[in-house]
Amino acid sequence: MGASGNEKHYVKWAKEATDAQGKRVAGNAKVSSPRDGTGNVYIAIVSTTAQAPTEEEIQIVQEYINTKRPVGANPVVSAAESIDVTIVCEIHKTAGYTEETVKSQIQADVQAHFLEIAFQSGVISLNFFKVSNIISAVNGVSEVVDLTINGKKDSITADYNKFFSLKGVIISVTE
């Protein structure tokens, strides 16, 4: 205890919580503090892999925050609600790179972006052009020929306590 318990503190505490093996359990968090006099502070978390956390991970974060919270605060930790995302793309591959290596790197880089944007302030946008740029920047990709996000060639948005969950990246490759 001792901190003021502002929203940044709750995000920091959520990200500090570790399991019995010392591994962080929350990749990011977003906080809502209604100004209604109840002392309730709602903390929605995602896992370190940008997926919905397990009940155990939620409990670990709840218990950790309970040790840090200021007197009078009532933190309530929950899983953020996921918005499933499927990305379908067609790329031209550069010679000298294996198809599997390129696909694996695209998947990893897109997943890293999902975690990075998981809980930006306000409405979160999964920007169509940013995703295209991420794929284009992968070593072995010479061109992104076609791209859709959830069947559309457009950005999508998520409100408070929601995050994007990457359900699949379907990649067709030509040289």
Regions found by a protein language model. Give the residues of each.
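Carbohydrate-recognition loop of C-type lectin domains
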Residues: 1-124
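An aromatic-glycine-centered, glycine-rich loop/turn in mixed alpha/beta architecture
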Residues: 104-175
